[in-house]
Regions:
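Active-site entrance/lid segments in N-terminal catalytic domains of soluble metabolic enzymes
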Residues: 2-8, 12, 17, 22, ...
């Protein structure tokens, strides 16, 4: 069965992709999502400011889960110098969508 689809000009093998969040919070998790078969990979949101995340920040029960993190707890430098290159080296060509910032400053610095 062909599940391929187009998303904003990208051709995906299937329409499944993770949301920006804890499941894609570093290069190891990005690779895990690729290996799990996602059609595209989305990073955890990267900001110009490090997040200070109070713990616990994830709550759930049998019917739902809530996450209160705003963006990555890692610096933009760690993403640019470590996580993204590590993922790209292991990627098989599937699209990588980088979630960046919340502010005008974030956009100016990160894009």
């Amino acid at each position: 069965m062909d599940l391929s689809t187009k998303f904003d000009g990208l051709v995906l093998a299937n329409p499944l992709m993770p949301a920006a969040g804890p499941l894609v919070g570093d290069s190891e998790r990005l690779v895990f999502m690729k290996d799990a078969g996602c059609g595209a990979i989305v990073t955890k949101t990267i900001s110009t400011k490090d997040a200070h995340i109070p713990r616990p920040c994830i709550y759930g029960d049998r019917e739902y889960i809530m996450n209160s993190e705003l963006w990555s707890e890692y610096s933009k430098e760690k993403w640019i110098e470590e996580f993204l290159p590590e993922f790209v080296a292991k990627n098989d060509g599937r699209p990588l969508i980088v979630s960046v910032g919340y502010t005008k400053e974030d956009m100016e610095v990160l894009i």
